[in-house]
Every structure is written in C-alpha cells, then in structure tokens.
Amino acid sequence: MSQLPVVLGAGLNTGDIIFQLIAMLILLALLKKFALKPLLGIMKQREDYIGNEISSAEQKHVQAEKLLEEQRVLLKEAREESHTLIENAKKIGEKQKEEIIQAARQESERLKDSARTEIVKEKEQAVAALREQVASLSVLIASKVIERELDEQAQEKLIQEYLKEAGESR
C-alpha cells in the first residue's frame, strides 16, 4: 500500500495536464463562439417567435371575444327591431282591418239608403201611373155611361167590367 501513492504520483505529468487543460479551454472557446452563440441565437429567435405567436393568439382571442360580443349586441338589436316591426305590422293590420270594416259599413248604409230612395221613387212613380190609369179609366167609364144612358144596373155592371179590365191590365 505504500507503493500506491508513489505509482500514482509518478504517472502524472503536469505538462500533459496543462496541455489538456489549454486544449479544453480552446475547445470550449471555439464551441462558445461557433456553436453556443448560434445555438443561443436560434433559441432566442425561437423564444421571440413563440412569444409573438402567443401575443398574436391572445390579441386574436381578444378580437374574437370583442367580435362575439358585437355580434351578440347586433343579434339582440335585430331581435328587438324585428319584434318592434312585427308589433307595428300587427297594429297597422288591425287599424286597416277596422278601416276596411268601417268603410264597408258606410258603403252598406249608403247602398241601403240609395235602395230605399229608389224604392220610394219607384213607388211614387207606380202610384202616379196608377192614378193616371184610374183617371183615364174613370173618364172612359164616364164617357161610356153618358153615351149609353143606361139604367142603374147596366151602369153598375159596366163599371165593374172596366174595373176588372183595369185590374187585369196591371
């Protein structure tokens, strides 16, 4: 066991250690310059890209929420407007219905009044025509009676015949 430390100490060369240490430092410097800086740059770019994408996604999410809210408001307004339009249309329809009914009633009354007036006029014309016929028949009967100078029974018979004849001619 006493020989072990001597063997270890004898095998170590300080020049080799320093050379390996310098080579390692040069290798680390080269790796840092040519590999680590570009790798860190790429990682930084990737980090910036991901950050921008997250920021963009958040902005788009905010915009989408804003648009969704605007659409909800517009939909609510459209529903209210359509409800108002429907109510107005119902009111206008009811008003027009009442106006049409009122106009029909007025027209009906006008037609009734016109028909009554026409009936009265035709009745008066018929009565006037009947009076003319009665008058002409009376004159005719009187002239016939005078012409014949009949007795009372013959006159009565003649009047009845003419009245019967006048009734049939109507």
Curated annotation (Swiss-Prot):
It is found in: Cell membrane. It comes from the Bacteria. The chain crosses the membrane at residues 11-31. One of its GO terms (cellular component) is proton-transporting ATP synthase complex. It is a single-pass membrane protein. Gene3D superfamilies: F1F0 ATP synthase subunit B, membrane domain (1.20.5.620). The keyword Transferase does not apply. Keywords: ATP synthesis, Cell membrane, CF(0), Hydrogen ion transport, Ion transport, Membrane, Transmembrane, Transmembrane helix, Transport. The keyword Membrane applies. One of its GO terms (molecular function) is proton-transporting ATP synthase activity, rotational mechanism. Its main location: membrane. F-type ATPases have 2 components, F(1) - the catalytic core - and F(0) - the membrane proton channel. F(1) has five subunits: alpha(3), beta(3), gamma(1), delta(1), epsilon(1). F(0) has three main subunits: a(1), b(2) and c(10-14). The alpha and beta chains form an alternating ring which encloses part of the gamma chain. F(1) is attached to F(0) by a central stalk formed by the gamma and epsilon chains, while a peripheral stalk is formed by the delta and b chains. F(1)F(0) ATP synthase produces ATP from ADP in the presence of a proton or sodium gradient. F-type ATPases consist of two structural domains, F(1) containing the extramembraneous catalytic core and F(0) containing the membrane proton channel, linked together by a central stalk and a peripheral stalk. During catalysis, ATP synthesis in the catalytic domain of F(1) is coupled via a rotary mechanism of the central stalk subunits to proton translocation. Component of the F(0) channel, it forms part of the peripheral stalk, linking F(1) to F(0). Belongs to the ATPase B chain family. This is ATP synthase subunit b.
